[in-house]
Amino acid sequence: MDTEQVTELAAKEPVAAPTNEIASSPERFINRELSWLHFNRRVLEESVNPRHPALERVRFLSISANNLDEFFMVRVAGIRAQVREGIAERSPDGLTPTEQLKLINETVSQLAIDQQAIWRDLRKFLAELGIVLVDGQDVTKAERAWIEDHFLANIFPLLTPLAIDPAHPFPFIPSLGFTVALQLTRTSDGRPMNALIRMPGKIDRFIRFPGAKDGVIRLITLEQATSLFIGRLFPGYTVKGQGAFRIIRDSEIEIEEEAEDLVRLFETALKRRRRGSVIRLEIEAAMPEELRQFVQDALATTDDEVFVVDGVLAMNELSQLTRVDRPDLEFAPYVPRHPERVRDHGGDIFAAIRQKDLIVHHPYESFDVVVQFLQQAARDPDVVAIKQTLYRTSNNSPIVRTLVEAAEAGKSVTALVELKARFDEEANIRWARDLERAGVQVVYGFLQLKTHAKLSMVVRREGGSLTTYVHTGTGNYHPVTARIYTDLSYFTSDPVIGRDVTRVFNYITGYAEPIDIEKMAVSPLTLRKRMIEHIHGETSFARQGKPAVIWMKMNSLVDPDIIDALYEASQAGVSIELIVRGICCLRPGIPGLSDNIRVKSVIGRFLEHGRIYCFGMGQGLPSAKAAVYISSADMMPRNLDRRVEVLCPLQNPTVHQQVLEQIMVANLKDTEQSWQLLPDGSSTRMKAAKGEEPFNLHNYFMTNPSLSGRGKSLKESSPRRLTRRNERPPS
């Protein structure tokens, strides 16, 4: 999109207060919850993007539904708890919890309507492409015979028909549980009865009929298949009415501040979470009103917690459709590259790092290099110690296996396992016990702080002294998500960074606050201060008439202090470009407040997850003298105040150039996957300016090598240099 177009849009956007008043008004912030819903709207819009293959569009629809489930389990649950407890504290944008709930429900209702409309269109489109989802009444005679055999062999044994009467009270329904409610009449005497059938959660939602006549794949949902054979479950009864419902429960964990055994404490809290209060009840529109009221009363839900859905429930499960064998309807497979510099050294990653710092750009470059770093450490007789943080990792994690191998080889191994990683708590308890059994020193960090920093440290004997090798990154030690999340892995043997990381581990394990961090910044101690100092520095350069530029890339921008510092910088004339995938509480493009701030969001094939912060230092951007950092932290109060995070400077010239001039420029240059954020928090798709070629950053990185990992092959083939068109100067 042309800068002039964005400016025009911003000028037309009404603001609720005069410019000279908004700078000190709560209206200078966008509501966090509504901003998140705007983000999820962008995800949903990808399901109608004609550039995406059909099954990828289904995947985006499924992701938007899954996102919404988690939003209710965590954010809405928290706001409802505030309302229940009579808390009227206003959010930074000036809304009470009750006001926020009202706006959330209005926005979600429209979002849900749009999801169903998109699914109806996608279902028709899939049918045209040879993937047909049939309703129960539309199965052929042969299909009915097959599905009956399949039902009796694979579904019937898993179902438990539940009559509801004084002797059989309404059962507990787990969060995200999918249930069919029935109104039945006994054939012998006409006596009415209500009943439930809970759909089993461990089998596929979509059942594929055998064969594919003329290449057409036909499927039926689990609930439709079950409805064909209700008589098998309730013989002697006639169905008078039925409908499915689904609930979402509060999934927040409350923990005591004093606990002798943190693992046992979390195990107890997880059991409580399974029985959290119902915060959302989704009911099929086809369910009779009397039956609907019966379900609502049994679950003790209020009217504003009930959402009547005219369509399919549990849209998060639509992703299962992408398993059908139609690779022509998916993104072409992509195989990540391996850094050539490591190959130049015969696979010796320590030698590659000793040569100079290395940055690996996932998923374009393989996460295997991170696993290799730890595997080589585990098997190297000169390695004496390994320290590792674990926030989220995969099932059957190679990282955990390698730490076990290292401990069994007699090395000193310390693992910080974060028990408070939401929805991964149970897995992390399991990993912690496996590691302890192998002899790993397992610590759990702080009760009040989550350890979100991504750190791995290897201490190796070299030439009579010890050398510390460090890996720090923007993403989790998770080989599965590393294939779809864009993140950065930074490897260095810089002794100063090594000392800083050692101090961070000592802080986590021994609670002693580091007072002499040299290069890095650490939250909750110094990270916010470092960021604000840099923003103020650019503000000062602007006031002196020097070039003043800030580029930032993050998942979320929420922190009021950071936002206010950026507003002040904008008013001083600093040119600020922000790439914020998710929540953004800053209002861009408001005259007199944020004229010089542009915000974009990138939504595409890969999930943008890296955090990069760049400051021109009086030279503008890009510049070899710029301050460039990567971090595990977003600019949110939780990251800056309630988590252990690190901000790491990139000072090696090649690494610095790759992140600033290749990765950041590509993100800013992208037009095919980008949205421009508007002052009201909504967004509009960007388009290439007149005369400018459309640019897709994901395609660029899939087809162009990185700089720092190229080794000697860089002389033979260099990545295509990126340039950006001139933009209007800051006012």
Curated annotation (Swiss-Prot):
Required cofactor(s): Mg(2+)
The domain of life is Bacteria
GO biological process per UniProt: polyphosphate biosynthetic process
Query: Which EC numbers characterise this protein's activity in its record?
Result: 2.7.4.1
Spell out the residue ranges making up region: Disordered: 701-731
The protein depicted here goes by the name: Polyphosphate kinase
- Pfam name, any one: PP_kinase_N
Q: Name one GO cellular component term.
A: polyphosphate kinase complex
Q: Is Glycosyltransferase a UniProt keyword of this protein? A: no
What is the gene name?
ppk
Q: What does this protein do?
A: Catalyzes the reversible transfer of the terminal phosphate of ATP to form a long-chain polyphosphate (polyP).
